[in-house]
């Protein structure tokens, strides 16, 4: 078994509850905002149409999932790059950056499959059931399906960025608590990016996705470079 297959097996084990977590959070979020919209007598448009409700629910799911994944990553492999534990990790033959890259990308790959499949399927089911529960939607079926897909992808990319930044700060400051606190702070700062897309064109959502993807790429490159160049003999090196 090569290192990639080994990391896939480990990731499936420590993220075994992620699918259930995403399902519960997303369905509960949709139900919550739908019920609130029904009792909103002032007629808030966001809470009374499919696009607004799915945007809000996807934002909540992204936020909780990001924090949960950072917690899992802290517990299962980020902690090994903090303090004296990192010395043993850097003795492995495949190299410090290669090991970390496989761990990080395998975790993000697992997250992407789980998040996209669940959020998109649940949102589509919600779209088809909107007539039954008397929720309006604008545009045709294809428009709404593209809208759901684009917002789900944006939420995932934003989540990737927050997770990678949290890991970077955690490793730089040598604290898993810092990583978790950073994830909470980033959710508060960036969470509204997805929620605010309910009223904008899919083209603009695509542009935001491209910018966030570029940001995540640069952050990931910096993080991997930092891991590679980290001097384990100097705890004060930044």
Where on the chain are the PLM-derived regions?
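Aromatic- and glycine-rich beta-strand/loop motifs that create alpha-glucan
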Residues: 1-23
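Membrane-helix interface segments
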Residues: 15-18, 95-96, 101-104, 175-180
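Residue-level recognition of transmembrane alpha-helices
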Residues: 22-23, 103-104, 152, 183-184
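Secretory targeting signals
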Residues: 28-66, 105-167
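Terminal transmembrane helical anchor/hairpin motif
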Residues: 32-56, 138-139, 171-238
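Hydrophobic alpha-helical transmembrane segments of multi-pass membrane transport proteins
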Residues: 57-87, 118, 214-219
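Transmembrane alpha-helical segments in integral membrane proteins
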Residues: 65-81, 156-178
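Helix-loop-helix units of permease transmembrane domains in multi-pass membrane transporters
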Residues: 76-108
């Amino acid at each position: 078994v090569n290192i990639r297959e080994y990391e896939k097996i480990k990731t499936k084990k420590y993220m075994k509850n992620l699918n259930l977590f995403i399902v519960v959070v997303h369905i509960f979020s949709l139900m919550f905002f739908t019920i609130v919209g029904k009792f909103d007598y002032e007629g808030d448009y966001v809470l009374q149409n499919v696009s607004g409700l799915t945007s809000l629910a996807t934002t909540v799911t992204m936020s909780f999932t990001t924090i949960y994944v950072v917690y899992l990553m802290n517990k299962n492999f980020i902690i090994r790059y903090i303090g004296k534990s990192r010395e043993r990790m850097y003795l492995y033959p495949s190299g410090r950056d290669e090991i970390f890259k496989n761990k990080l990308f395998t975790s993000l790959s697992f997250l992407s499959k789980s998040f996209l499949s669940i959020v998109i399927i649940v949102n589509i089911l919600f779209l088809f059931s909107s007539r039954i529960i008397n929720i309006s939607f604008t545009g045709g079926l294809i428009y709404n399906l593209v809208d759901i897909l684009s917002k789900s992808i944006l939420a995932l990319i934003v989540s990737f960025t927050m997770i990678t930044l949290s890991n970077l700060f955690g490793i730089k400051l040598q604290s898993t608590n810092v990583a978790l606190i950073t994830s909470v702070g980033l959710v508060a700062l960036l969470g509204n990016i997805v929620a605010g897309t309910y009223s904008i064109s899919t083209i603009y959502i695509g542009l935001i996705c491209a910018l966030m993807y570029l940001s995540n790429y640069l952050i990931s490159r910096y993080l991997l470079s930092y891991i590679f160049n980290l001097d384990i003999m100097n705890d004060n090196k930044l």
